[in-house]
Amino acid sequence: MLASLFPLARPVLHALDAETAHRLTIRALSLLPAGAPPADDPRLAVSVLGRHFPNPVGLAAGFDKGAEVPDALLSLGFGFVEVGGVVPRPQPGNPRPRVFRLTGDRAVINRFGLNSEGLAVVAARLAARAGRPGILGVNIGANKDATDRLADYVACTRALAGLVDFVTVNVSSPNTPGLRDLQGEVFLDDLLARVVAARDEAASPRRAAILLKIAPDITLDSLDAITATALRRGVEGLVISNTTVARPASLTETTLAAEAGGLSGRPLFAPSTRLLAEAFLRVGDRLPLVGVGGVDSAEAAWTKIRAGASLVQLYSALVYAGPGLVREIKAGLVERIAREGVPLAALVGRDAAALARME
């Protein structure tokens, strides 16, 4: 239903500022009955992270920050949904305006600053949907004014790990000062050790997988250290990548491109895919990868998979293409799987060496 309405709603939504339009979308989703998602072609199924995903196409964190409408989003056909980011105490984030559409570039810049209703509110919403079907994850961070950021991640993990299928440790948001410093080897080692321990202490049979979300703007030496630390500390997967602080010369919306914040959408595709491929070359099948950044078509999702992604996520593309994009991507993946004549899992990372050098 939403997919058919989007062409009519898009001019209205895009006439509004981006954040207001997004709140209206969340409101609309909350009013619609969350029906069962459409049945997926079995060739799209993925078994990873200790779960059986009906398809590999997920919704990235940031769309449903407060876990208000996860079931409505799953009903759109996503194989999984990641809510958040969540921080322990409510915080307003950065002043508005803080999100900008670069329409000519099919991109978005945001500097939300991890605005969140706080851990208690999100945990209550997730607890209220216990027992419902669908694979759900949560993205966690630290309060901007936290005196002990590691403790913030531990608190979020303890409260949420028994309510979701995976917890994504976000140390890569460019909009919280100093947060990306936690990607440094010493900090990261301590952080992951404590988060994994907190997950293991959670008295829940669900045992959420722990994922780590990293920035696209790191060096290969940093990637070496991050992947080694993740493997050593028992992290179950990497999410590659968050938004970029870089501004490619190809951007046409030059005035908006000067806005501070993280850039997502189509311009992020190449750098995030290169990093994804480099990560796969380092970890192989020892650590599942989630490919994020510029996934706006079946071909883009297919490329992420060949670069090493077992799962993919999208968000910014929905701003321009609407929810019907999910169905289009899945149909395109089925066509490509049929053409190749091999299971989807056999295609993961097949072209990583070449895609690590993509322009």
From Swiss-Prot:
Protein name as annotated: Dihydroorotate dehydrogenase (quinone)
The cofactor(s) it depends on are:
FMN
Chain residues that bind FMN: 61-65, 85, 139, 170, 213, 241, 265, 294, 315-316
Name the residues that bind substrate.
65, 110-114, 170, 175, 242-243
Assembly description? Monomer.
Where is it mostly found? membrane
Native species: Methylobacterium nodulans (strain LMG 21967 / CNCM I-2342 / ORS 2060)
What is the recorded function of this protein according to its Swiss-Prot or TrEMBL entry? Catalyzes the conversion of dihydroorotate to orotate with quinone as electron acceptor.
CDD domains this protein is in? DHOD_2_like (cd04738)
Which PANTHER family did the record assign?
A: DIHYDROOROTATE DEHYDROGENASE (QUINONE), MITOCHONDRIAL, DIHYDROOROTATE DEHYDROGENASE (QUINONE), MITOCHONDRIAL-RELATED
What is the E.C. number?
1.3.5.2
Which note does the record give on the cofactor?
Binds 1 FMN per subunit.
The entry sums up its family as follows:
Belongs to the dihydroorotate dehydrogenase family. Type 2 subfamily.
Q: Which UniProt keywords apply?
A: Cell membrane, Flavoprotein, FMN, Membrane, Oxidoreductase, Pyrimidine biosynthesis
Lineage of producing organism: Bacteria, Pseudomonadati, Pseudomonadota, Alphaproteobacteria, Hyphomicrobiales
